[in-house]
Amino acid sequence: MAAAAGRRMGPSWWGFSPALDLQVHCLQGTIQHLTSSDGLPELNILLVGGGDGRHLLKTICQASRWPHRKLKFFIIESDLELLARHMLFLSLALEHPEQMGLQEKSELFLELFGNSLIRSKTANYLQEKSELFIQCVTDPDYQQCVMPFLNLSSIKFKERDELEDIFKFWRIADPKLFPIDKYWDGKNRRHLGTRYDSRKGAYDWDLSMKLHDRGAGVINSREYNYWREKGVAFMNREGVYDVPNKTLASQMVVPQSSGKVLTRGYWGDITTSPYVAFGIETEEKSLLETANGVHVKSAQEIALHNIISLFHELATGKVYSVPASGQAEAELVKPVGDYKTNGDQTAAETIEEKAEAEDTKQSKYKGFITLNNVEIHFLPLSWVNELHCKGRFTNFFNLLYFSSSMVHLLKPEYKVIAASKATLVLELTKFMVDLQADKVQSYVSIVTKLAQGAGFTSDEPIDWKTHYIARFERGDDSVELQTAQ
């Protein structure tokens, strides 16, 4: 069941739980047992299957809330395309304020994060960034110069070559190479089968009986149904969304009449939605208010506010305050029906985009916001079964996170790499639409056994109806296994 929850479902382009500031979820015993480097406590975090980078981003953006620590992230993903997206989202979050405004940056992030189709302006940005990433993965010295917070030294040469190919694919302007609207509809038809002709009812059922019942009531039917139909979740400005988002392309071995063939397509989620990651929780409780039992704000609006807040805090080190009505967040989401997705681009928008493109050419690139005391290490997928064999990681990780799609890889050997009193965070399947309630409930027992097998215990009761993560602590009686140096 743990494996079935996510094994080869395709890449987890967005997670099945809201973004976490991982320092919030570090148990007190973990914090008390941190070791220091250069006078700073060091928090070593292993992320296995984080997927969309939401936990990484939120933890980095909110680091100024905590006592000064050195944060070291070690990331293992199921697909190299996910590491490529990590690089994109990190570089976007760290764009210098003089290079890109807060509102524009936040809208661009959500568009690339959760949309199958993007604006031509956004596609141009992606192509430009792809050039940078190609240089980074092919020239380590250049990468350390422009993105010193990122460490790719553990990535194998073959994986570097594959990352280069991914970025080269992103760089190609031809939309015909990735007809995601066709892929999306095809996957929808296969998923729904005979229900396809009455799919609006299926969408409403999943939203009401799964997402709403499990606590994601802020997602409204209009935005959810539109995403289920088109794959477009965030449309924060008037614009034409007609360019395939190539960052959602990946390859999978698919059985065909001629045998198994490596095929590029869209292999990700079409039921849970990108809204869960950033759009169903917020510190600004006024955004969760209801009127006559209906949420006043949409998941899109909440997601935009949350991303603006995170990026503001990253740039300034200060918690974001909601501006007075009519100021900075005036350009929030309009009803989905007002959006244009093809063919009806206005002359005014064309003029605006040309002017913005010209401004971009004339502006001098300012580089990235400096990340102090943060290291991000990409690790090969094969290492998920080899970390305990590498002496450098013995008793090393203070916090370990496994997504629901990769928790089946949590083995007893992980007690070797967990530091004293380490925290283990496991994603649950509460918001996984494709699972019935009995499967969501039984999943808790399964992952608890996996955690216990790896030497972790918990005194916290886990309620499958309300919790979307489970926390465990490394037990004192954990037995060290023999490791190879």
Swiss-Prot record:
One of its GO terms (biological process) is motile cilium assembly. The keyword Cytoplasm applies. Signal peptide: none annotated. One of its GO terms (cellular component) is dynein axonemal particle. Its main location: cytoplasm. InterPro entries: DNAAF3, DNAAF3_C, DUF4470. Belongs to the DNAAF3 family. Required for the assembly of axonemal inner and outer dynein arms. Involved in preassembly of dyneins into complexes before their transport into cilia. This is Dynein axonemal assembly factor 3. The lineage of its organism: Eukaryota, Metazoa, Chordata, Craniata, Vertebrata. The gene is dnaaf3.
